[in-house]
Amino acid sequence: MKVYIAPYVYWIDNPDDTEIKRGKNGREPFGLIVKCPYLHLIGLNKNPRNVVLASWRGQTQGAIGNFTMFDFWGDGLMVKNLTMGNFCNVDLEFPLKKELGREKRNSAITQAHVAYCHGDKSYAENVHFISRLNMNPLNGAKRILFNKCHMESTDDALTGTGVYLDCTLHFYGERPFWRSDMGGAI
């Protein structure tokens, strides 16, 4: 399935919802669980900052547990030309319409995940992955290629099964990988 996404800020979890999110069945809380093999999410703008998929929760900041924006299930996930960000501890700046920006929820950095991926052969091209602690960009895929992507995070953030080709990596901590014995490479 191909999903084309027009420039805008799309909240996967309502940032104005004051309810504290809790996980189910022993898992962390998720913004959206997606079960769809060969899902392609494609931003309709070459600048990934102009198509934003966002959340605004983290551990103890709107959630009990490490809030994760997406939980993808299926082989062949592809994301392209967009930003996937958990803006719990990072300001969201949207260049096309400033009023869609949002100040970070809290300056105290907490676990705020972007996405888990249960499957194989995942691919990201020209995507900005933004969060801080435990960013987890498509974490869990058996194999994933990040091509020309941008990563912003602190510790325990990069997936151990990813290959990062021509990516820019901005680390604000000392240990970007949570695990590195699974075949990942930069």
Regions flagged by a language model, labelled:
Residues M1-I186:
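Sequence-level preference for short, compositionally simple segments enriched
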